Structures are given as C-alpha cells and as structure tokens.
Design a protein with these regions (language model features):
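Sec-dependent N-terminal signal peptides
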Residues: 4-14
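Scaffold/interface architecture of coatomer-like assemblies
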Residues: 18-313
Length: 313
C-alpha cells in the first residue's frame, strides 16, 4: 500500500518529563504497493489456531489468486497506537482508562512499540518528538496521564486520521490502533466518510471501545463499529468503564494471535483495480486435512485514497 500523508493539522503538543528508555531500532521493510492483511484464525469452538504455515493460507484480490510476499506467524512485534478521547465526557473514567491501558501494554509482546494520542478538539502527542514510540513502562504511563486532560469537545475523525499517519512511522509492518471514545464528533475538520476511506486505504487494523453515555445524543458507536469492521478489527461496547480492562486484555490476546500476510497485487488484479478503486480481498485458511477454519480480516481495501486531515508532525 502507498503511504498515506494527510495535510497538516495544528496540534497542541504536551511536554513530558524525559525518562531513560531502552534504545531499540526495530526492523522495518516496505514496498510502495504492498498490501498487508492481519488475519485472525479460529476453530469451530472459537479458539485461536496457532502454528499454521504460509501454505495454509490462500489470498484472493478481486477473485484473482495472489502470491504472498511475506508471512508473519503469531506474536510478531507490533506498532500500537492508543487513541484516547480526552474530551470533558471522559473525566469520570480517566483513572480506569489509564490503569486498563497499562495492563494492556503489559499483556502485549515486550518488543512492541507504543504511541499515545489524546484528543478533544485538538490532538495531543505526549511522547517527546525525539522518542515518539516507546515500550518503556514509566514513559508510557506519563504519556497516558498527560494525554487525558478530560476537557473540551471531540474531534475523533481528526484523531483517527492522525493515528493512521503516525502508526506508519513505526518500525513494524504490523500496525494497530486502539480507539477509546464514544464515537461522537463535534470538532473535526474532516468528515466521517473521509476518515473511513482513509482507514480502508491503510494497512492498520483498528480496535474500538465505545464508552457511551446513554444520555449523550452526540455519541456515535456506529462509527466506531464501522471503523473496526472495515479494517479487520473488533468493536466493543462495555456496559460500564470497569469492563475496559477485561476488554483490553481480549484485544491483547487477539493481536498476539494475528497472522500477518503481505502481498503485491498481481498484474491481473492491478489491471482490474484501475477501474475499481475498492479492491475486494478474501483469505481462505485450511488445515492439512482440508478442514476450513474461521477467518477474520478486512474484506476490502481502498486504493488511491489518502485525502484527509490529521497529520501529526
């Protein structure tokens, strides 16, 4: 996939006290037209199926078989973005969200790298510019505290666009966003349709947690659900904030059990794609016995998109 670059959005940068972090430079490789699929594979009982080889996977784009360029088994390192609603409605849940997010980071692969974006009507990047990603627990905790100031309106569309751009600057092909919000937007400069198109054009998988006040008429959990579904992620709607930690533990397990497949569209698929910007994708996974397994991944991606607002600089 081509790298998305969104026009600049003015951001409020939050200063964070510096902390000593382990210095690591993760490996990264990319191709301009590389399509990345994150694939969850489960058996009939709903359990994750591990240990599969590349030969078990078959990829189709617009019904044309594709040659897999790279294949990562489960639990390969991930670049993870935590996008946390910091509008006034978040105030009662602030401490629970911070604690749940820290527990989530501990449940992930120690090699993973994290970034945090807090958002109200502005987008806050609490990690320092010279170290925009971290797997150092104290730095992550400080970033979470700084990100959630719980005030102002909500620009969730801008925040997702910013996260989609930011995550591509990380060191790993596996890219994940986790969005905690009610989905309502009253301050973005971009539209719902634009951000959904940008999500479909990215290689990131998005998990969403809809923290919805039943009395809030601006909440839009449907947007969050659509965002997750379009990228092969999962959307959750907890009954109360106390369920956030359990949900984030589920998200951590799901991420660590994902397979990641990359391919460059074949000439036949690319030729058809010139006429159809939305490219349909299907992944078939079978055991050596021929038994078909349940697969979750994105069902399409959007070629040639990337116009929007929310660049983090």
């Amino acid at each position: 996939m081509k790298r998305l670059l969104f026009p600049a959005l003015a951001l409020a940068l939050v200063a964070v006290p510096s902390a000593q972090e382990p210095d690591s430079k993760p490996n990264f490789s990319s191709q301009s037209e590389l399509v990345v699929l994150h694939v969850s594979v489960k058996d009939k009982k709903g359990g994750y199926v591990g240990g599969l080889s590349q030969d078990a996977f078959r990829v189709l784009e617009n019904r044309q078989p594709q040659e897999i360029s790279f294949f990562h088994n489960q639990d390969a390192p991930v670049t993870v973005g935590m996008l946390i609603d910091a509008s006034g409605s978040m105030a009662p849940n602030r401490d629970l969200v911070i604690a749940a997010s820290m527990a989530f980071s501990k449940a992930m692969n120690p090699q993973d790298e994290f970034f945090v974006l807090g958002f109200n009507e502005q987008i806050h990047t609490p990690l320092p510019a010279e170290k925009p990603f971290t797997n150092f627990e104290p730095a992550l905790r400080v970033a979470l505290v700084q990100a959630i100031k719980a005030r102002g309106q909500t620009a969730v569309y801008n925040a997702v666009n910013a996260g989609l751009d930011y995550v591509q600057r990380g060191g790993f092909e596996r890219q994940v966003l986790v969005v905690l919000s009610d989905g309502g937007d009253n301050a973005s400069s971009t539209t719902r349709a634009q951000v959904l198109a940008n999500a479909q054009a990215s290689n990131a998988v998005i998990y969403t947690i809809a923290l919805v006040d039943p009395l809030d008429q601006e909440a839009d959990p449907g947007f969050l659900s659509q965002l997750s579904e379009s990228t092969g992620g999962v959307s959750f709607r907890p009954k109360n904030a106390k369920e956030i930690e359990d949900i984030l533990q589920q998200v951590a397990r799901d991420i660590r059990n994902l397979y990641t497949i990359g391919y460059v569209p074949s000439e036949a698929a690319a030729s058809q794609a010139r006429r159809e910007a939305l490219r349909r994708v299907a992944v078939d996974v079978r055991l050596p016995t021929g038994q078909k397994l349940a697969v979750r991944t994105r069902r399409a991606y959007l070629a040639g998109a990337g116009e929007g607002s929310g660049d983090v600089r």
